[in-house]
Amino acid sequence: MNALRTFAAASLLSVVAQAALAAPVPFAGSLAAADPIYNRTLAGNPPGALSAVGTAVSYDVYGFTVTANGSYLMETLSAAFISGTADDTFITVYQNIFNPLAPLTNALQADDDNGPGALSTITRSLNTGVNYFLVVTSFDNRQFGPYTGRFDTVTGGGQVIVGGAPGALPEPSALMLLPLALAGLALSRKRSAA
């Protein structure tokens, strides 16, 4: 019975520690005429064809990994493009490599308007040990301007690491539970010793 209590306390501690690391990771950029261009894909899971509208869109690429297998959210939160629909973003997530000359190769999922308004959102399962690339672009050619977005953990307790560096500090609410978990572990050990 004591071993079961110790195991339960250790499991609780593990869950609390993982939850403490699952913080949103913001990103921000700006699409400009001087950026590289490519023929983006159509939306899909996975995308199956190239766009006939977004044939020469500027893009930014965010390389990232995850620290635990789980479900992760990638989304644009705002955009202020100076032509076309002001917030019409388009995102694609790739695994292993992104090659703008072969935009369908390694494309896992692409989204146009699943976020609010014309913003983009992808939620998908990702695994540790894989390099991923989020490509942020516009729906139409020659749409330039700033945008913001974020990565977030949905399930799994892992953290998104953008460009090889942790993106955010642990959540304060989860860290406040850590002393409670440690106290429970100490109490179970004290009872088992008696």
Model feature map: region roles:
Residues A79-D88, R142:
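Extended, low-complexity, turn-rich repeat/linker tracts enriched in Gly/Pro/Ser/Thr and Asp/Glu
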Residues P170-S188:
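A short, hydrophobic C-terminal helix/tail in secreted or cell-surface proteins
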